[in-house]
Design a protein with these regions (language model features):
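Small/aliphatic-rich secondary-structure junction motif
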Residues: 1-54, 82
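Glycine-rich, Arg-bearing micro-motifs that act as flexible, cationic patches
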Residues: 108-133
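General small-molecule cofactor/ligand-binding pocket signal
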Residues: 32-34, 85-89, 140
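A short acidic, glycine-rich active-site loop
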Residues: 52-68
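Short secondary-structure boundary segments
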Residues: 35, 112-114, 144
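Structural beta-alpha unit
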Residues: 75-109, 146
Length: 146
């Protein structure tokens, strides 16, 4: 089985990771851990003014943070016997997850129900809602915290 795991620093992402460890067979499962780094804009940009990107150093720092998060997740999965890979991609997490599921020919895409933004939609977060609608494979949304 090929699984794509959407991962960030939210408790729901950790719950999704733990779901894999509890429910999948390591010898039969390849997990690709995906985290996306949005290119942020300054909070002070005027509505009609062009967005001002953050300095490269800040984007690199955020990218390193995502890489460290994914490395810890990878270590946990490998200790449990899973074959893993990591992708930290620039851009929107919704598109990064759907595209990775497509290119990796995933059988299952797993995400937590809400990400680190803490801005819930009606039932699911915006990333979960998007991947449920657009992923080329089955999607598991983990709601229960580990």
């Amino acid at each position: 089985m090929r699984i794509v795991l959407g991962f960030d620093d939210s408790p729901h992402a950790v719950a999704a990771l733990k779901w894999i460890v509890r429910n999948e067979k390591p010898a039969e499962t390849q997990v690709t851990i995906v985290s996306a780094v949005r290119t942020p804009v300054t909070a002070y940009a005027e509505v009609y003014a062009p967005a001002v990107p953050y300095p490269t150093e800040l984007i690199e720092e955020v990218t390193r943070h995502h890489e460290e998060l994914c490395k810890r997740a990878q270590d946990e999965l490998q200790r449990a016997g899973f074959s893993t890979s990591v992708k930290v991609l620039p851009g929107d997490p919704r598109e990064a997850l759907v595209e990775t599921a497509r290119t990796e020919k995933a059988d299952l895409l797993i995400v937590g129900s809400h990400g680190r933004t803490g801005l819930p939609k009606l039932v699911l977060g915006s990333v979960a809602s998007h991947v449920v609608a657009h992923a080329p494979c089955d999607v598991l949304v983990v709601k229960k915290l580990a």
